[in-house]
Amino acid sequence: MSKSDQLFEQARQTIPGGVNSPVRAFNGVGGTPRFIDHADGAYLYDVDGQAYVDYIGSWGPMLLGHNHPAIKAAVIKAVEKGLSYGAPTEIEVLMAEKVRQIVPSMEQVRMVNSGTEATMSAIRLARGYTGRDKIVKFEGCYHGHADSLLVKAGSGALTLGQPNSPGVPADFAKHTLTCVFNDLDSVCEAFTQYGSEIACIIVEPVAGNMNCIPPVPGFLEGLRAICDEAGALLILDEVMTGFRVSLRGAQGHYNIDPDLTTLGKIIGAGMPVGAFGGKKKVMQHIAPTGPVYQAGTLSGNPVAMAAGLTMLDLLLEPGLYEQLSAKTARVAEGLKAAAAKHGIPLAINYVGGMFGFFFTDEPEVTRYEQVTRCDMERFKRFYHLMLEEGVYLAPSAYEAGFLSLAHGDKEIEHTLAAAERSFAKLAG
């Protein structure tokens, strides 16, 4: 028995399912998870000494690769001054200013500790600002595990086959209207029926929790217009896409001006950080300046802020996102070519530093329902073949993949060679 298997068995005695987030348990692909000892650059190293080229990147934060020396140095310097104060610090001011500099729609910013906190707080603010109760989200999109958002949610909830989680009261769910991603008609229908009651639309501008589904042309622009007409707020959930699909996130890439934005993952450089922000007139409704309550013991933690501020400074390097996009395109197109060589139907989506692949005969995948029709058994086989080759993909057909700037020619060439061998075995 491997050390990973031993640790997993041990973990299941004290941790539900042996993991602290469901997708890590490998239920979506079968088998048992690899326990990680350390990481560096583009690689993960498990407790059994196996190295993997990593395409999860801690589920998105590691845009510069693991164990970046400048970020590590900033964290160590901050730790030496103290771990947490529960009082304002200069670095949280600098962090908020940096976010506003990069993402101009975020005129004011509130720091929190996770993406879930960010989306939960942004929705509460939208309800408080508009005086309305209902929200619109999209089937297959995931915005964290807050009660009002686990309604036909994607990601782990979808993989578990229970899109409505037990423990979510029906009274909460009834205020969440679920529409079809990339289908404006479904949104118009919701607003026709409930428009005066809808506080906001919340959307992943690139849906990264039903694999990777970019918006079709006109979709995000249509949401902006619908919100403007109905007096609702548009919330872009950029927890995943923020600083990943471009420096200004998806809103910069697609030229969309939201009322509120939520951030996570990259903003903390691997530390537990989230943020939400937007138009000053809306953000002024948050306590202590307004009546909408939000608070957090560790919000704006100085160690986490040091990591995040250093990350954002590094992302300002000219040409960085062009490099990242080129790397992603090389991997995505290489996977598609390798599959085609062996007669394996494969659709590919990618934007910026994120990508997704689908075992399907359909030439393009733009809807959640298409994702559910993909060949999940073939994905599971491919996943384990790649894992044996030392390539660490997301252990779920519903999760996006992520590249980092640390992925060089060596890592990409290894990945594509491994993919060709794996596709050959699938076809055999």
Swiss-Prot record:
GO cellular component: cytoplasm
Gene Ontology BP, a term: protoporphyrinogen IX biosynthetic process
InterPro entries, sorted: 4pyrrol_synth_GluAld_NH2Trfase, Aminotrans_3, Aminotrans_3_PPA_site, PyrdxlP-dep_Trfase, PyrdxlP-dep_Trfase_major, PyrdxlP-dep_Trfase_small
Gene Ontology MF terms: glutamate-1-semialdehyde 2,1-aminomutase activity; pyridoxal phosphate binding; transaminase activity
Broad EC category: isomerase
Cofactor: pyridoxal 5'-phosphate
Localization (cell): Cytoplasm
Disulfide pattern: none
Protein name: Glutamate-1-semialdehyde 2,1-aminomutase
Provenance organism: Aeromonas hydrophila subsp. hydrophila (strain ATCC 7966 / DSM 30187 / BCRC 13018 / CCUG 14551 / JCM 1027 / KCTC 2358 / NCIMB 9240 / NCTC 8049)
Gene encoding the protein: hemL
